[in-house]
């Protein structure tokens, strides 16, 4: 039996399916490429405020606005951001990946992978880290989204954990481990710990 090849949508296909099984809002046709679309970075980041992150507990964080003049990211820090765009996909698998132009500056995106699910809707949370200080700006074109056809039955996204997200989403791993959203972390002098680090 001949297998059906899994195919990536071209930029033209992406545009022709907008409003049907693909939603990208806002959409700018100038950001289409031959087989992807460039998504942009919103104007805010999130950083954790725990010296040790606990997978079984919600971890405290603070928000960092990205000013128009830019924000310098530092090595050794995990930054969470999100896309400006809200996307919705039906019957296709969306995948995002960092742009090579930023990788060549030492800025890397989502090392854990960015495989979406058919039926996902919301903004995308982005995991950013750099190998040397790098300055970023609000609404830069941060990543590319591609759409892949699915072979076989494709049930819509059933998980509500990150579905319908309109904000940066920190890890919710603690829910998978059976813990609730109560803050069980000890108070830590995060700024003092950073200042005292040799």
Curated annotation (Swiss-Prot):
Source taxon at top rank? Bacteria
Keyword terms, alphabetized: Hydrolase, Nucleotide metabolism, Nucleotide-binding
| GO aspect biological process, one term | dUMP biosynthetic process
Query: What top-tier enzyme class does this entry carry?
Result: hydrolase
Pathway the protein takes part in? Pyrimidine metabolism; dUMP biosynthesis; dUMP from dCTP (dUTP route): step 1/2
Q: Does the keyword Cytoplasm apply?
A: no
Q: Which proteins does it associate with, and in what oligomeric form? A: Homotrimer.
UniProt function note: Catalyzes the deamination of dCTP to dUTP.
Into which family does the record put it? Belongs to the dCTP deaminase family.
This one is known as: dCTP deaminase
Species source reads: Rhodopirellula baltica (strain DSM 10527 / NCIMB 13988 / SH1)
């Amino acid at each position: 039996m001949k297998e059906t090849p899994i195919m990536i949508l071209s930029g033209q296909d992406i545009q022709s399916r907008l409003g049907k099984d693909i939603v990208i809002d806002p959409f700018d046709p100038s950001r289409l490429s031959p087989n992807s679309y460039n998504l942009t970075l919103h104007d805010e980041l999130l950083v954790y405020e725990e010296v040790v992150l606990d997978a079984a507990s919600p971890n405290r964080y603070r928000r960092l606005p990205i000013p128009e003049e830019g924000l310098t990211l530092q090595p050794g820090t995990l930054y969470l951001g999100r896309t400006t765009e809200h996307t919705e996909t039906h019957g296709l698998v969306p995948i995002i990946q960092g742009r090579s132009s930023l990788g060549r500056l030492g800025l890397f995106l989502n090392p854990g992978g960015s495989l979406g699910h058919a039926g996902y809707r919301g903004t995308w949370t982005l995991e950013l880290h750099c190998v040397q200080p790098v300055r970023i700006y609000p609404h830069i074109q941060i990543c590319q989204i591609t759409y892949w056809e699915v072979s076989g039955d494709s049930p819509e996204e059933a998980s509500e954990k990150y579905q319908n997200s309109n904000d940066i989403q920190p890890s919710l791993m603690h829910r998978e481990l059976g813990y609730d959203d109560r803050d069980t972390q000890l108070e830590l002098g995060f700024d003092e710990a950073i200042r005292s680090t040799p």
